[in-house]
């Protein structure tokens, strides 16, 4: 059943990736997907400069956000934990928007570093305020901090109205206009981070038994928590720097896949990565074809999917 699930998700991902290249305001014929990859062909510019970069970003950012959600849920043993619910997304967004508004000439390659610093600062403050891994308190504290970071972001935009357009589009969580400059920065980092997450599989499995038992079985709990959390924040921040704050993938996908595959992280992490990539590719495709030529922010569609799921989880855990 698990192998069949992986095959199904992989085939669905491949099919949606082809549809993403094919569909849009300017449809690309299926034959052109095989032939028009060299300069001078009719659909070369649409494929190479517009659709392929955003498809690659959707694949890797979706996978990274889902894996970050798995890591955070495993670290705190909390099914409500995710980068966006805990406020990491919004803290990273605040740092990135501050850079976009206050230092507009800043190179794109610096954004992931600033987003990472903002995400880590938000996570440290959350740990200081919550002082517990109790699911409801963590979730509520994270939501409160998210509102705080969002308010500060709004203040920054109101104080710099002349520079607000790019920041406003970026804040909705969008793949629109993403070119190879974003791909060259974000994807090498994702290629480094995603395999590293597999090194935590055994320790996260043992952490699920409780800190005391995990320590008895040879896990350095503080060491594992620190490095796994650092990796999760790094993946989230890189995704935020590339595409803006895309909500709920880190919450919905890990929880859904855990209910299907079980809690073994060696299975859960790869399946969640594939499903996160699939969800973001589908959301980006729908964002382009629902109301052409207008394009919806992809973050709006992921929020429409994820918000009811989060409410259902809260109600079920009462």
Curated annotation (Swiss-Prot):
UniProt keyword Ion transport, yes or no: yes
Membrane topology: Multi-pass membrane protein
Keywords noted in UniProt: Cell inner membrane, Cell membrane, Ion transport, Iron, Iron transport, Membrane, Transmembrane, Transmembrane helix, Transport
Gene Ontology CC: ATP-binding cassette (ABC) transporter complex, substrate-binding subunit-containing; membrane; plasma membrane
GO molecular function: iron chelate transmembrane transporter activity; transmembrane transporter activity
Pfam family of the protein (one): FecCD
Induction data: Induced 1.3-fold by hydroxyurea.
Presence of the UniProt keyword Transmembrane in the record: yes
Compartments where found: Cell inner membrane
Any single GO BP term: intracellular iron ion homeostasis
Cytoplasmic side: 1-2, 77-105, 159-179, 247-269, 316-318
Result when mutating residue 51 to C: Retains 32% of wild-type citrate-mediated Fe(3+) transport
Entry-linked InterPro entries: ABC_BtuC-like, ABC_transptr_permease_BtuC
Entries under SUPFAM superfamilies matching the protein: ABC transporter involved in vitamin B12 uptake, BtuC
Record field: transmembrane: 3-23, 56-76, 106-126, 138-158, 180-200, 226-246, 270-290, 295-315
Periplasmic side: 24-55, 127-137, 201-225, 291-294
Quaternary structure, from the entry: The complex is composed of two ATP-binding proteins (FecE), two transmembrane proteins (FecC and FecD) and a solute-binding protein (FecB). Interacts with FecB.
Function field: Part of the ABC transporter complex FecBCDE involved in citrate-dependent Fe(3+) uptake. Probably responsible for the translocation of the substrate across the membrane.
Family: Belongs to the binding-protein-dependent transport system permease family. FecCD subfamily.
Name listed for the protein in its UniProt record: Fe(3+) dicitrate transport system permease protein FecD
Organism of provenance: Escherichia coli (strain K12)
The organism's taxonomic lineage, starting at the top: Bacteria, Pseudomonadati, Pseudomonadota, Gammaproteobacteria, Enterobacterales
Gene this chain is encoded by: fecD
